[in-house]
Every structure is written in C-alpha cells, then in structure tokens.
Amino acid sequence: QMCIRDSIAVALCVAKAAETLGAKPEKIEVLLSANILKNAMGVGIPGTGMVGLPIAVALGALIGKSDYQLEVLRDCTSEAVEQGKLFIAEKRICISLKEDITEKLYIEVICKTEDKTAKAIIAGGHTTFIYIAKNEQTLLDKQQTVSEEEEEASPELNLRKVYDFALTAPLDEIRFILDTARLNKAAAEQAFKGNYGHSLGKMLRGTYEHKVMGDSVFSHILSYTSAACDARMAGAMIPVMSNSGSGNQGISATLPVVVFAEENGKSEEELIRALMLSHLTVIYIKQSLGRLSALCGC
C-alpha cells in the first residue's frame, strides 16, 4: 500500500520543524520508519502534479502550516510548487531510514540553518507529535502512555456485534453512511473523465470490460473501485470518504456495495445497511492489522 496520508504526515512534521526553526531551512534531514518510507515514496501529492516525498518535504518547509494538521499543504500554489522544485534541485533534502526502531509510524525531521537547528518527531499517529526541540532546548517531550496494541484492541468489536448493529440500528442513525456512496462514486466518475495514475479503472471500463472481462456487475465493481483509487493515488483534488484513516480502504468498502446494489435494484435501506456492514467489517479487521500495515489494507 502507498498512502497519501503518510506523505502528508511527513509534510506536517517538516512544517512543525520549520516553524520551530523560525527561518527557511537550508538543509532538511528526514528519518522515517520502514513502513512510512515505503508507503509514502510513490504517491501523488495533491495540488502539485508531482509524486514522491521530496516535494512533500519541500512544500512542508516552504508553505506548510502545522495548525492545518493533515491539510498542512492547503495553501499550495503553482508558484510554491516551482519553489519546491528548486529547493529539491539544490539538494537541500536528505531522506533516509531510521534504524533500530520498533514503531511502525515514525517521522523525524531536522531543519537547519547555519546557526540554528530544530527537530520534530511524529510517532504512533499521523498527527501525534512526541518531541519538539530548538537548538538545545526541548519544547515537547511526550512519551506515549498507551501502546499501539492496547489502543487498537480497545473497542472490543466482533463480527456478531458488527452484523447485528448493521441490520438492526435505527435507519436514521446510520443514514450518514450514504455520504460514502456519494463521494466515492463521484471520485470514480471523475476519474473516468481524465487520466489519473495508471488509469486502470478507465482502461477496465473500455475495451477490456466488454471484450475481455465481460460486461457484468463484477467488471463494473472492478472498474469503479479502481478508478476512484487511481484518482486518489495520483493526488487528484477529488474528495473521498476514508475508513480507518485510509482513503483506499474507504473506497474498497464502499464502491463494490454501491455498484452491486444499483445493478440489482436494491432499496435505499438495503444499501445503507450493507454499507454499514461493509465499513464496520473493515474496522473490525483493521483492529488486527494495526494502525500501519506494510501490506495494502484494501
């Protein structure tokens, strides 16, 4: 799995370190856990038309605002992207693996000028700062009091609870789940109109769907789900509804259900309850996978 959220978390950590430095960094050192490094290295960064960690790091330093959290690059402009490209070309960024750590989600950033240094560390959660320092002065040093395993196990879900809730909960209390259908289907339909990522969904919807895979509900499920993921992974400015913090998991939990329901004439209530069952099942499974898996969560 490659994840935009991981790239943006790196940009957030860079922004915090740069803000703490109080000046435009001359050098930026980024140390990442293996999972973050692998997940973030090949995804599109929204609003830039570019792929990879260097542009996320550069923009985090140049225009990032840590107060925006995972919208840290909200103020990105074409001019900022050009400045970021120059920052990269000047070889001011060094990205490497953080050795000898067990934390799957770990981001350490050191920003430097000629006479100042600032460090920020995110660990355990994509917006969880555990350490901030400027020069030799520690500004934040917060060790996690709850292990990842304990935190993930806390809801105590099981499949019977998930199933019973999805089938018996008052309809008006779970109607909000239709927002996942609206947003994620719109993302797929937008992807069909353009060329995003590998354009797998668009390709499946064309000749391959009709002549190779067959024009069936199953091929339609594949094309819609792939198209929405194409747009998201390419960094398109298209909103999707996530599940457990993952856009791809949200798409995968939503679009197969939506396409099947539409093509089989299911009622709105059946769609709502099926979507709720699907999304809660993903959350139940995610408890066992942990916060950040090295494999694709979808």
Where are these regions (language model features)?
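Short, small-residue-biased leader/transition segments that mark boundaries at the very start
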Residues: 2-4
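Early transmembrane hairpin of solute transport permeases
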Residues: 11-101, 107
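Hydrophobic alpha-helical bundle architecture
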Residues: 17-20, 260-273, 283-298
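Signature of multi-pass transmembrane helix bundles
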Residues: 89-235
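Hydrophobic, small-residue-rich transmembrane alpha-helices and their short perimembrane loops
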Residues: 228, 232-250, 284-292
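Alpha-helical support elements that line or immediately flank enzyme active sites
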Residues: 7-23, 249-266
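Hydrophobic, membrane-inserted alpha-helices
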Residues: 37, 279-283
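Generic structural signal for well-ordered, non-membrane alpha-helical segments
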Residues: 7-10, 14, 46, 50, ...
